[in-house]
UniProtKB/Swiss-Prot annotation:
GO annotation terms (biological process): D-gluconate metabolic process
Record family assignment: Belongs to the gluconokinase GntK/GntV family.
Protein's UniProt keywords contain ATP-binding: yes
Species assigned in the record: Gluconobacter oxydans (strain 621H)
Gene3D superfamilies registered for this protein in UniProt: P-loop containing nucleotide triphosphate hydrolases
Record's protein name: Gluconokinase
Main function: Phosphorylates gluconate to 6-phosphogluconate.
Pathway assigned in UniProt: Carbohydrate acid metabolism; D-gluconate degradation
Reaction equations catalysed: D-gluconate + ATP = 6-phospho-D-gluconate + ADP + H(+)
GO molecular function, one term: ATP binding
Pfam annotation, one family: AAA_33
EC number(s) reported in the record: 2.7.1.12
């Protein structure tokens, strides 16, 4: 356990902060990692260069495009579980099959699904700078999204709230479960 986990009375968790582009995955995930002393991985950084190029030219990814990326995300999660310390990964995890691939080998992964209105997402993506994914791909991501079912290990949070509020809600949730 990290010092932060011990101070807060939390056991290590292995989280995938998920949702379409613009939900605030990175903000929430880095906030959790910082507050709790967990390891963090930006899932976008694991994309093969061909995927980044494809998205940056406005082309949506296919399942075949995503497969090697999801494998790298899974491998990172598996290493974190093996090490036994808390970890947070950002990953859109749009389809149930993607989430199942991330949880392969029976990894104890939990998903934090950030749900944000289409209007808010569009506004955020129009204002966002320095990211390879253009706002024009939002409709494709929304069409691909399979909202996690009640039978999946998911915590739902609102992306409409301030990130600090979301962080506090998540930490309270973890404390209540531990």
């Amino acid at each position: 356990m990290t010092e932060h986990e011990t101070q807060m009375g939390l056991k290590p968790r292995f989280l995938v902060v998920m949702g379409v582009s613009g939900t605030g995955k990175t903000t929430v995930a880095t906030g959790l990692a910082t507050r709790l002393g967990w390891h963090f991985q930006e899932g976008d950084a694991l994309h093969p260069p061909a995927n980044v190029e494809k998205m940056s030219t406005g082309q949506p990814l296919t399942d075949a495009d995503r497969a090697p990326w999801l494998a790298l995300c899974h491998d990172w999660l598996r290493e974190q579980v093996k090490a036994g310390h808390g970890a947070v990964l950002t990953c859109s995890a749009l389809k149930r099959s993607y989430r199942e691939q991330l949880r392969g080998d029976d990894l104890p992964i939990e998903f934090v699904h950030i749900d944000t209105s289409t209007g808010e997402l569009a506004d955020r993506l129009q204002r966002r700078e320095g990211h390879f994914m253009p706002a024009s791909l939002l409709p494709s991501q929304l069409a691909t999204l399979e909202v996690p079912g009640d039978d999946e290990p998911v915590i739902r949070v609102s992306g409409e709230k301030h990130p600090d509020v979301v962080l506090e809600e998540l930490i309270r949730h973890f404390q209540a479960e531990d």
